[in-house]
């Protein structure tokens, strides 16, 4: 814990707990006489204590986070100052050595025409890939639509399995006609 974090904790959290601000007895004195012994008063005090504890926990977390951010910004400022100092170095060889040592790669910088050419190639490559993917998606969509259309029995107002149903009904009627004379004789 750094010094700033310690100061913020001491200043903001020293009287943070509800019990250090007001006791349960003092809390009860805030309410009318007839309600002072009600258990709800004690539950309300406990609830307020819990809420206060949650706020203090958030405050502690924010203090810690802020101290980390402040520490990081100090480091960033120190690095920026060091970079400025390095940029003002008058001796060219020292500056070149420092730049070479601190750069992440030692590639030679490109001129603007090379950069423009490479960017144009990259854009063209991206457009080519995009068009290929669009064509592939179109082909897949057509294939999917044809498969879905072939599965539909209602295409061209055709009812599903109508021929099979008609055949079953006709065979049932024939068997009933054959059985009907014998059934009529049994009823007589």
From Swiss-Prot:
InterPro entries: Nkp2/Cnl2. Pfam families: Cnl2_NKP2. GO terms for biological process: cell division; chromosome segregation; mitotic sister chromatid segregation. It comes from the Eukaryota. It is found in: Cytoplasm; Nucleus; Chromosome, Centromere, Kinetochore. Keywords: Cell cycle, Cell division, Centromere, Chromosome, Chromosome partition, Cytoplasm, Kinetochore, Nucleus. One of its GO terms (cellular component) is nucleus. Component of the inner kinetochore constitutive centromere-associated network (CCAN) (also known as central kinetochore Sim4 complex in fission yeast), which is composed of at least cnl2, cnp3, cnp20, fta1, fta2, fta3, fta4, fta6, fta7, mal2, mhf1, mhf2, mis6, mis15, mis17, sim4 and wip1. PANTHER family: INNER KINETOCHORE SUBUNIT NKP2. Belongs to the NKP2 family. Component of the kinetochore, a multiprotein complex that assembles on centromeric DNA and attaches chromosomes to spindle microtubules, mediating chromosome segregation and sister chromatid segregation during meiosis and mitosis. Component of the inner kinetochore constitutive centromere-associated network (CCAN), which serves as a structural platform for outer kinetochore assembly. This is Inner kinetochore subunit cnl2. It comes from Schizosaccharomyces pombe (strain 972 / ATCC 24843). The gene is cnl2.
């Amino acid at each position: 814990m750094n010094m700033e974090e310690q100061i913020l904790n001491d200043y903001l959290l020293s009287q943070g707990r509800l019990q250090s601000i007001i006791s349960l007895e003092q809390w009860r004195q805030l309410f009318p006489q007839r309600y002072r012994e009600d258990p709800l008063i004690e539950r309300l005090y406990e609830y307020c204590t819990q809420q206060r504890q949650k706020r203090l926990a958030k405050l502690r977390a924010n203090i810690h986070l802020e101290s980390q951010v402040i520490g990081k910004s100090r480091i960033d400022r120190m690095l920026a100052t060091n970079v400025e100092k390095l940029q003002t170095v008058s001796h060219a060889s020292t500056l070149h050595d420092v730049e070479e040592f601190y750069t992440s790669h030692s590639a030679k910088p490109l001129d603007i025409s090379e950069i423009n050419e490479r960017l144009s190639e990259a854009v063209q490559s991206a457009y080519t890939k995009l068009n290929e993917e669009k064509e592939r998606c179109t082909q897949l969509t057509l294939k999917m639509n044809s498969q879905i259309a072939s599965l539909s029995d209602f295409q061209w107002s055709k009812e599903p399995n109508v021929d099979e149903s008609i055949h079953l009904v006709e065979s049932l009627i024939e068997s009933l006609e054959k059985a009907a004379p014998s059934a009529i004789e049994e009823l007589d």
